[in-house]
């Protein structure tokens, strides 16, 4: 009997082991199959699939997803035909750049021309291409190009004293993006009328200068002047939005040439919390602004001495040639007198972010380099008011001098492009927006503690920047959230160029302590005529003011 029971138990255990083994094998087989499918799926993944799976914050800094296609085939064929391209391109470059070199010729130079110009035997390498969508009437390509060539470029330089110097341009290293626009599309072969060529982005342009048979440093300042002239010539002859239009089929292609499309008006208001570049005292900041980095198109503000929170309140105008791609660049420098100015920080804003005909009030964070966006150091901020005014009667912006329904500032600031309207634009600069500004200081909140009792005795000093008119509120004792509800009226002679400054002070028996300030242009109140808002205190960790502003305008004109 025991034997039979043992046999039965053995059979049951054996069957259980077999069943368990089969299930384990099936499970392992299923896992292997799933793993194989997963590996196969990864093998089929595209770059776009990877970008969908992982958000950008998980990418290492060295991972870059390129949208460009490789051009090995083009580089192979370009190497073969380069001797012919060299000859044709050299003539084209000479014809395009030489007049611009003469235009930007330094004052110490009497003439500046090309004595020799060939591009050498090394062909450039195209590292990628992409197609830009959105143009129904043409095809736009962008080509990444890198060139470390051996060109033979000699400039014929004649100084004011009559000395001729052959200056060789050597060791050229260039990296950039070229834009080719095939437009307009036509029915005749090759199906486009012209090709527009432009340098869309200049990533790197390095070169050295050498006097043939001499030393360029023998003439102080000549090397720097020639180098700046070359860079300006490249910028003004081929860099976007400038383009070279090459007709393929005979026709009128004047519409493809560069034309101004609008005007950008910029009010440089102020900056705050700038990095101090001086070991003794404070920096002496000034600003440079440009849309295209050319000498005559770059605007410079006045220098504010010994101030890390400068107030400029200056107005500048810039011609816009392509609002969809151009941007305004602001660079803040520390004025070092006879020495080279030191960069404090820079910022930029794309013009496509501006709504035509509407004033945009922005604070831009300053960075060390616009190309590197990982700068976390606090370099300060700059305050701008921007107004983009497109040219042309079809842009929806009406002539400001014939529309009574617009606000005062809109009547002053908007213009069009006809001759009559351009005359109005010139007249606009002589407009004075005069009126009465009514300011009600309502209250403040979260004023910083100023005394040992954990309280403050705040009051507000109001002043007009241009006229110097001043008023002040009463003192509210022992309060970090004071309420004043006091109204002050200021007669403003030129509202477009004046500013309201409100300083908050702590009253003490034997003096006063500065807490913070608010600086307001009159742009918003002139446009809206009346509003109420909160304003944070600059130069203070906490605190804000609630104000009610009202404008009663009377626009007049200077006699001209």
Swiss-Prot record:
Alphabetical list of SMART domains matching this protein: C2
Keywords per UniProt: Calcium, Lipid transport, Lipid-binding, Membrane, Metal-binding, Repeat, Transmembrane, Transmembrane helix, Transport
Domain SMP-LTD: 67-249
GO CC terms, sorted: endomembrane system; endoplasmic reticulum; membrane; perinuclear theca; plasmodesma
Domain called C2: residue spans: 243-364, 417-535
Entry keyword Calcium: yes
Transmembrane spans: 2-22
Binding positions (Ca(2+) 2): 451, 457, 506, 508
Main location: membrane
Cofactor(s), by name: Ca(2+)
Subcellular location per the Swiss-Prot or TrEMBL entry: Membrane
SUPFAM superfamilies given in the database record: C2 domain (Calcium/lipid-binding domain, CaLB)
Binding-site residues, Ca(2+) 3: 451, 506, 508, 513
Binding residue positions for Ca(2+) 1: 278, 284, 334, 336
Membrane topology summary: Single-pass membrane protein
Location of the region described as Phospholipid binding in the Swiss-Prot/TrEMBL record: 227-523
UniProt cross-references to PROSITE patterns, sorted A to Z: C2 (PS50004), SMP (PS51847)
Molecular function GO terms recorded: lipid binding; metal ion binding
PANTHER family for this protein: EXTENDED SYNAPTOTAGMIN-RELATED, SYNAPTOTAGMIN-5
Family: Belongs to the synaptotagmin family.
Function: May be involved in membrane trafficking.
Name of the protein: Synaptotagmin-5
Gene: SYT5
């Amino acid at each position: 009997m025991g034997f039979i029971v043992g046999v039965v138990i053995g059979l049951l255990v054996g069957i259980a082991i077999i069943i368990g083994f089969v299930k384990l094998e099936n499970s392992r087989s299923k896992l292997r199959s799933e793993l194989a499918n997963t590996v196969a799926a990864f093998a089929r993944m595209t770059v776009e699939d990877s970008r969908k799976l992982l958000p950008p914050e998980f990418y290492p800094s060295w991972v870059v997803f390129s949208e460009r296609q490789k051009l090995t085939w083009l580089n192979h064929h370009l190497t073969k035909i380069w001797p012919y391209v060299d000859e044709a391109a050299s003539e084209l470059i000479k014809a395009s750049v030489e007049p611009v070199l003469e235009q930007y010729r330094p004052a110490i130079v009497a003439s500046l021309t090309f004595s020799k110009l060939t591009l050498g035997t090394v062909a450039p390498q195209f590292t990628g291409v992409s197609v830009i969508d959105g143009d129904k009437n043409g095809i736009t390509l962008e080509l990444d190009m890198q060139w470390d060539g051996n060109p033979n470029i000699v400039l014929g330089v004649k100084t004011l004293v009559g000395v001729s110097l052959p200056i060789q341009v050597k060791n050229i290293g260039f990296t950039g993006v070229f834009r080719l626009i095939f437009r307009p599309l036509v029915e005749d072969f090759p199906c486009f009328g012209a090709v527009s060529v432009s340098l869309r982005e200049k990533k790197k342009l390095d070169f050295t200068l050498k006097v043939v048979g001499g030393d360029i440093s023998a003439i102080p300042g000549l090397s720097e002047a020639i180098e700046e002239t070359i860079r300006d010539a490249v910028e003004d002859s081929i860099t976007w939005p400038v383009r070279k239009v090459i007709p393929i089929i005979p026709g009128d292609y004047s519409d493809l040439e560069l034309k101004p499309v609008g005007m950008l008006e910029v009010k440089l208001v102020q900056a705050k919390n700038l990095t101090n570049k001086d070991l003794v005292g404070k920096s002496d900041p000034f600003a440079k602004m440009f849309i295209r980095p050319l000498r005559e198109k770059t605007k410079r503000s006045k220098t504010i001495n010994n101030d890390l929170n400068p107030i400029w309140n200056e107005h500048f105008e810039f011609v816009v040639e392509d609002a969809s791609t151009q941007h305004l660049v602001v660079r803040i420098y520390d004025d070092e007198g006879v020495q080279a100015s030191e960069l404090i920080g820079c910022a930029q804003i794309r013009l496509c972010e501006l709504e035509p005909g509407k004033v945009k009030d922005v604070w831009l964070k300053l960075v060390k380099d616009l190309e590197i966006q990982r700068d976390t150091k606090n370099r300060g901020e700059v305050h701008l008011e921007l107004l983009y005014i497109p040219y042309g009667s079809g842009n929806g912006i009406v002539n400001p001098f014939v529309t009574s329904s617009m606000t005062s500032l809109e009547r002053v600031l908007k213009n069009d492009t006809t001759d009559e309207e351009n005359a109005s634009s010139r007249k606009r600069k002589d407009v004075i927006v005069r009126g009465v500004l009514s300011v009600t200081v309502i209250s403040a909140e979260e004023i910083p503690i100023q005394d040992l009792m954990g309280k403050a005795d705040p009051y507000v000093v109001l002043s007009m920047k241009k006229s110097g008119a001043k008023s002040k509120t009463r003192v509210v004792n022992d309060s970090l959230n004071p309420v004043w509800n006091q109204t002050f009226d200021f007669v403003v002679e030129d509202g477009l160029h004046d500013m309201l400054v409100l300083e908050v002070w702590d009253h003490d028996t034997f003096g006063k302590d500065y807490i913070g300030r608010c600086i307001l242009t009159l742009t918003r109140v002139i446009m809206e005529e009346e509003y109420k808002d909160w304003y944070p205190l600059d130069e203070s960790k906490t605190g804000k003011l609630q104000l009610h502003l009202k404008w009663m305008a009377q626009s007049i004109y200077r006699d001209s």
